[in-house]
Each structure stands twice: as structure tokens, then as C-alpha cells.
Amino acid sequence: MVRARVRLSGVRGSYSAVALADTGARMTLVDRSLAERVSVEYTGRALSFVSVSGHPVEALEAVVPELEVEGEALRYEAVAVAEIPEVVKRVLRESGLDENVVLGLLTLERASMVSDAAAGTLRRVEAFIL
């Protein structure tokens, strides 16, 4: 498992944690209760996806004013907000990871980071555009 230090700064508050960096997840997922607590800005777009467990998940797209990943600050990051199932939260907790945030590939790419599974961390890389 790859871990990353994150800090979400919303309109009304912020939240710091060590989260799972999941390259199998397209978007960063934020639990609804945390999104409400820090006050994210909803875009009005509904999202549907299938979780790793095979269950359908309904989410809302939102924008976090600032999402910091391993010290790299990303302004106005789009995230998926949903109720993370308790079974998933339990697995994350048992792995020593935060249960409210799962980093997705789009966030990692925007931060110019790749997953280093051998080290269990993220690594900065040079960004380039083709």
C-alpha cells in the first residue's frame, strides 16, 4: 500500500491525514461527512462508479479549494464526495490509513507524483506534455 500525507482545506476548515494513494481510483474520494465538515463546493455533477468490492457508488463532484499532497499544494482540486462504506473504512483503519480520503490518479498526476509500491510512498517526477 502506498501512503501519502494530505491536507484538505475547505471553505470552513481543514483536515490533515495519512491517506491511501490508489492508482486504481480515477478521482480522489472524500467521505461525505468530512466534505460537509470542511465545506467543499459542489459542482452539481453526479458521478457513478463501481468500487473495488464491485458495488455501485453514487457520488457528487465537488471542488476542494486546496488539496495538499506530500507538500504539493493543488488549488481547486475536483474530488468525488460519497459515503464511504463502513467495510472499506474498517480496512483502511486496520491498515493504519485515514478512512475519509482516498487519493486518486488524477490528483497524483496533477501533483506530478507516481506511486512507488516498493517503498510504499509517492515520488515526484518531472511533468511533461506531449
Model-derived regions, located:
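Pepsin/retropepsin-fold aspartyl endopeptidases
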Residues: 1-130
